[in-house]
Swiss-Prot record:
Pfam family, one: tRNA_U5-meth_tr
InterPro entries reported in the protein's UniProt record: 23S_rRNA_MeTrfase_RlmD (IPR001566), MeTrfase_TrmA_AS (IPR030390), MeTrfase_TrmA_CS (IPR030391), NA-bd_OB-fold (IPR012340), SAM-dependent_MTases_sf (IPR029063), TRAM_dom (IPR002792), U5_MeTrfase_fam (IPR010280)
Name of the coding gene: rlmD
Protein name, as recorded: 23S rRNA (uracil(1939)-C(5))-methyltransferase RlmD
Originating species: Bordetella bronchiseptica (strain ATCC BAA-588 / NCTC 13252 / RB50) (Alcaligenes bronchisepticus)
SUPFAM superfamilies, alphabetized: Nucleic acid-binding proteins, S-adenosyl-L-methionine-dependent methyltransferases
Length: 466
């Protein structure tokens, strides 16, 4: 059945949203404001998924996708939408999530942070598959919503130097001893090097090593090898062990890293994000600052250039060790301290044990920082950070944690905005600023939270006894 629909909005999977007979329809390939004919491909009791058959009235924000693989490759979802419109949709999604999850509205919306629209992806995981029906080896991202590897010949979100490697990598893998046992190549670009990490399930032969070295010499890349888990990753050539690094020129910092370490995908936006975070945090020379989920010290070291002391906390000792080394190399060893701790299991006593912080930066993974938010909400007015900047890659967990800090802890959500870290995708990176309110308001919020918790415990006890 073919329907004619008016598209009302867009979700973060870049599907148009329409309604018909009280049912929601998610329409692949449609944009807000468009009138389209669609074919339903999946029916559920409360919604349907459809695809566009014909665009009867196109959106003024529709643009021609640059990539010939768009729509098949799962690496991008929004190339058919103007970049400014992509950011506007992400900003609306952030605001909607704050309200629906946390019943919160930021007092101020920060202007979006923009960066390069193309060639920005300095870190990527490429899958490798042998597919005889498609001519042999494929190297690229998965197809959209599929486990199949897309038949990619170019990629415009990868830097051009990496995009040009896609076809040569196919030929290289095909020339090796066991191409069907090499499932993955990770890409990591530093400011001065391109590193490729080959995942191989069988030992490499001398011939394989020769092929890798010839490829590296021809294309100007460096190979690292991974035979099992992350701890087996090592450079093919020993002299390449310290080649990868990114810079934060505003703070005079060079940050070395390993190719499988977490670093931000978009180096240009990372520089802008660090700069904005520190401006929002407004660190003073006498301030002691915490950086939770600090990783390699992406924020910790810049913070140490401005405050009295920066304390980085992270769950991986390997990362905190390297952050400490980087701080020492920059002469920041006496102004930094690092601790290894699982931040998903902390409590208020642990937080008190670290001492008083004037400011705090939180930059968690997608799971958010619920335990940290709960601990912060329990701190007394005189023992809590006055200002907190929270950098998030998941609006849902940010809104959840914000609700705890505001409704239970007496913080105010002063401002929030999006960071266009991942153009053409549905990923939403954002930043939010919280400030502790006056003592009376904090104590009132904490008392109300305790009362609500008691009432909920009584309700559960009554339900269990019934």
């Amino acid at each position: 059945m073919v329907d004619v629909l008016n598209i009302e909005s867009l979700d973060l999977e870049a599907r148009g949203i329409a309604h018909r007979d009280g049912k929601v329809l998610f329409v692949e390939g449609a944009l807000p404001g468009e009138r389209v004919t669609v074919q339903t491909v999946r029916r559920k009791p409360s919604y349907e998924i459809a695809k566009v058959e014909e665009i009867l009235r196109p959106s003024s924000q529709r643009v021609a996708p640059r990539c010939p693989h768009f729509g098949v490759c799962g690496g991008c979802a929004m190339q058919h939408l103007a970049p400014a419109a992509q950011v506007a949709i992400k900003q609306r999604a952030l605001e909607d999530t704050f309200w629906h999850v946390g019943k919160l509205k930021p007092a101020r919306i920060l202007p979006p942070l923009y960066g390069p629209t193309w060639g920005y992806r300095y870190r990527a995981r490429l899958s490798v598959r042998v597919v005889p029906k498609k001519g042999g080896v494929l190297v690229g991202f998965h197809e959209r919503k599929s486990s199949y590897v897309a038949d990619m010949r170019e990629c415009h979100v990868l830097p051009p130097a990496v995009s040009r490697l896609l076809l040569p990598l196919r030929a290289m893998i095909a020339a090796m001893s066991a191409p069907d046992r090499m499932p993955q190549i990770e890409v990591a670009l530093g400011d001065e090097a391109i590193v490729l990490v080959l995942r191989h399930l069988l030992p490499l032969t001398d011939g394989d090593i020769a092929v890798l070295r010839a490829f590296a010499a021809e294309h100007g890349v460096q190979w690292w090898l991974q035979s099992k888990g992350p701890d087996t990753v090592h450079p093919l050539e020993r002299e390449h062990a310290d080649a990868l690094a990114y810079t934060l020129p505003e703070f005079g910092l060079r940050m070395p890293y390993r190719p499988t370490d977490f670093t931000q995908v978009n180096h240009a936006i990372n520089r802008a994000m660090v700069s904005r975070a520190l401006k929002l945090l407004d660190v003073q020379p006498q301030d002691r600052v915490a950086d939770l989920f600090c990783g390699l010290g992406n924020f910790t070291l810049p913070l140490a250039t401005q405050g009295r002391e920066a304390v980085g906390v992270e769950g991986s000792k390997a990362l905190t060790d390297r952050a400490h080394e980087a701080a020492a190399r920059h002469g920041l060893g006496e102004r930094t301290r690092f601790a290894t701790l699982n931040l998903f299991e902390v409590d208020v006593q642990w937080l008190r044990g670290l001492g008083y912080f004037d400011r705090m930066l939180i930059d968690p993974p997608r799971e958010g920082a619920q335990a940290v938010a709960q601990a912060l909400s329990l701190l007394a007015p005189g023992e809590r950070p006055r200002r907190i900047v929270y950098v998030s890659c998941n609006p849902g967990t940010l809104a959840r944690d914000a609700a705890i800090m505001v409704h239970e802890g007496g913080y105010a959500l002063r401002s929030a905005g999006v960071i266009n870290m991942f153009p053409h995708t549905g990923h939403v990176e954002s930043i939010a600023v919280f400030e502790s309110l006056d003592e009376a308001t904090v104590l009132q919020a904490q008392a109300q939270a305790r009362q609500k918790a008691r009432e909920e415990a009584e309700r559960l006890a009554e339900a269990a006894a019934a």
